[in-house]
Structures are given as C-alpha cells and as structure tokens.
C-alpha cells in the first residue's frame, strides 16, 4: 500500500511539474510575441517617418510655401496670401528678383534663428548662377528674364531638390530662356510657369516652355496683374496646356512625391 501511495505521489509530482513547465513556456511565448509586436509597431512608425512627403502650399500669384519632410519651411517670393499662411517659422526665404510683388519679406514675421534669405543678388553672385545646399534642400539658381521688364542679369528661377530626390522648378518672372531645353535632361517632378502675359510670357508661350522642360507635372502660376488684387484666375490657368498639368487654386496644398 505504501508502495502504491509512493507511486501515485510521484505521478502527481511529475504532472504538477509538467504543468508548471508548460505555463512557463506559455509565458515566455507570450512575452516574445509582445516584444515582436512592439518591434513591428516601432518599425512601422520609423517607416512612416522615413516616407513622409514634403508639401507645397500655393499662396497665390508667384508666392509659394514648401514644408519639407524634415519640417523645414521654405518661402518663395512672399507677397500674396493670407497672413496665417505665413505663420510657420521660416528656415529659408527665396526671392527671384526685386519687383515689389516678390519681396514682401515683412509678411514672414516668424523666422528661426538660422533662417537664411537668398535674393537674386546672392543667387547671381559674381554674375554666375549659384547653388546652395542646406541639407534638407539644394537650391540651384537658373536663368530667368529675357523680356523688357525682366533683365536676365537681374532675375533668376530656382530648382529645389528635396531629400528623397523630389525636384521643383520655379520659373520666376520670365519669357522662354535659352536654358529651358537642357532642363528636360533633369527629369523634373514639378515645374511652375508664370503666364500673366502682361509683363511675362502668356499661357501659349508658357505651354511651349512646358513642352521644352518636360517635367512630370507642370503648373501655371503668376497669372494675373499684381495690381489687380486677384492672385488666381482659373480661366487663365485652364488655357495653360501641358502633359501632367496640375492647376492649384490659391490656398491649395500639394503633396510632393
């Protein structure tokens, strides 16, 4: 009898130990699964940050605000647009030339301590088109002008290359330039063409320029007389013809990708 009881006690002990061991294994598996889930969630968040796209806000007329993937803020030709649109602190301010409708820097009251301002003077230093690399963006000055209102020696356009390789061409105030055909080799993502037809090229010439530049997307801007107080005219914008055309209303935002 004692022997039988000893056998039963041994069996119960083994069963109990096995049960405890199984529970430990389950706990370990559960902990491993939780760690894996947390790692996957963290990786997903990092991927989302890595794939965050820059945005472009069309302020109207020739004025644009770009917010990079790093949350750096670039203003180009400040003039048109609500004051609220100029609220984000500037990291970089670009001006294509000195006409009043491209240099209202006072609209940008909020600037980071290391904010830089590049006007046509810096962009054309030494009579050469300059390139500036800020890490979050590379800015290349290119030709602009070629009409009686805009001297090619006093005006520039810009090509902005963002991290990730997205490129944005801003014609500035100009007519057709000798450099435009060569820009096709750059395979630009976005190209903005002025088309007011008063001081610069009209929509027909701007459409021809878009055919020369061959950007993935071409966008009309600077389409009215600055003195009119109207800084977007859809009827003019729709006369601009180009492959991959995008029409941005004043105050409309575009994700750059």
Each predicted region: which residue ranges?
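Divalent metal-coordination and catalytic microenvironments
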Residues: 66, 97, 139, 173, ...
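C-terminal motif of bacterial Sec signal peptides marking the signal peptidase cleavage site
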Residues: 16-19
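Positively charged n-region of N-terminal signal peptides that target proteins for export
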Residues: 1-8
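Cap/insert and terminal regions of metallo-dependent hydrolase folds
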Residues: 176-256
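Bacterial signal peptide processing site
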Residues: 21-24
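Core dinuclear metal-dependent hydrolase active-site scaffold
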Residues: 28-32, 37-88, 123-186, 201, ...
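Active-site metal-binding motif and surrounding structural segment of the metallo-beta-lactamase
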Residues: 74-75, 80-126, 185-192
């Amino acid at each position: 009898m004692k022997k039988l009881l000893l056998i039963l006690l041994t069996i119960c002990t083994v069963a109990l130990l096995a049960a405890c061991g199984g529970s430990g294994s389950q706990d370990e598996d559960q902990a491993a699964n939780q760690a894996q889930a947390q790692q996957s969630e963290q990786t997903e968040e990092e991927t989302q940050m890595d794939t965050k796209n820059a945005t472009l806000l069309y302020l109207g007329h020739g004025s644009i605000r770009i917010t990079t993937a790093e949350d750096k803020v670039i203003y180009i030709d400040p003039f048109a647009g609500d004051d609220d649109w100029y609220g984000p602190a500037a990291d970089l301010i670009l001006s294509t030339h000195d006409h009043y409708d491209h240099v209202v820097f006072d609209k940008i009251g909020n600037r980071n301590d290391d904010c830089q301002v590049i006007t046509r003077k810096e962009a054309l230093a030494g009579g050469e088109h300059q390139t500036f690399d800020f890490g979050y963006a590379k800015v290349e000055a290119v030709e602009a002008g070629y009409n009686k209102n805009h001297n090619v020696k006093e005006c520039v356009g810009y090509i902005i290359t963002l991290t990730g390789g997205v490129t944005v061409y801003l014609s500035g105030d100009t007519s057709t330039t000798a450099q435009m055909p060569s820009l096709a080799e750059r395979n630009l993502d976005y190209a903005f063409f002025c088309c007011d037809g008063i001081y610069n090229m009209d929509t027909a010439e701007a459409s021809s320029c878009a055919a020369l530049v061959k950007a993935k997307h071409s966008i009309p801007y600077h389409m009215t007389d600055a003195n009119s107080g109207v800084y977007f005219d859809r009827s003019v914008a729709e006369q601009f013809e180009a492959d991959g055309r995008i029409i941005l209303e004043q105050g409309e935002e575009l994700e750059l990708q």
